[in-house]
Curated annotation (Swiss-Prot):
Keywords, comma-separated and alphabetical: Cytoplasm, Ribosome biogenesis
Subcellular location: Cytoplasm
Oligomeric and partner information: Monomer. Binds 30S ribosomal subunits, but not 50S ribosomal subunits or 70S ribosomes.
PROSITE patterns xrefs: RBFA (PS01319)
GO CC annotations, alphabetized: cytosol
Organism: Proteus mirabilis (strain HI4320)
Functional description taken from the UniProt entry: One of several proteins that assist in the late maturation steps of the functional core of the 30S ribosomal subunit. Associates with free 30S ribosomal subunits (but not with 30S subunits that are part of 70S ribosomes or polysomes). Required for efficient processing of 16S rRNA. May interact with the 5'-terminal helix region of 16S rRNA.
Similarity comment text for this entry: Belongs to the RbfA family.
Protein name: Ribosome-binding factor A
Annotated GO MF terms: ribosomal small subunit binding
Gene assigned in the entry: rbfA
Length: 133
């Protein structure tokens, strides 16, 4: 019977859970704020992992948000060794992957798209209401 998921996919899912727990409970850097792990891409040999994070305390597209993201990513990449050591204790792997953190803007982009759609719907309702009068 064939497996539906490769080992790398299973490891990346487990890493996502464990890193989220580590960020929530162990990392105390205020620059990180409310970071969530949205995904993990891992190399086939399990040597490198790219961790995608989002920051929940951002508003839609402000200048200060970009600075907060840069500071948060810098703090996460500086703490990558510490997070990797805790990850090694939490997971049973022969080699714990080297971690790099990247910002996942899909949440902010989704909020922006949702706002655009709701604005178009409001405008359409206003036009329809004016035509009825």
């Amino acid at each position: 019977m064939a497996r539906d998921f490769s080992r790398a996919q299973r490891v990346s899912q487990e890493m996502q859970k464990e890193i989220a727990i580590i960020l929530q409970r162990e990392v105390k850097d205020p620059r990180i704020g409310m970071a969530t792990v949205s995904g993990v891409e891992i190399s086939r040999d399990l040597a490198y992992a790219k961790v995608f994070v989002t920051f929940l305390n951002l508003s839609a597209g402000e200048e200060s948000d970009e600075e907060m993201v840069e500071n948060g990513l810098k703090a996460l990449n500086e703490a990558a060794g510490f997070i990797r050591s805790l990850l090694g204790k939490a997971m049973r792997l022969r080699v714990v992957p080297e971690l790099t953190f990247a910002y996942d803007n899909s949440l902010v982009e989704g909020m922006r798209m949702s706002n655009l759609v709701s604005n178009v719907v409001k405008d359409d309702e206003k036009r329809r209401h004016k035509e009825e009068e």
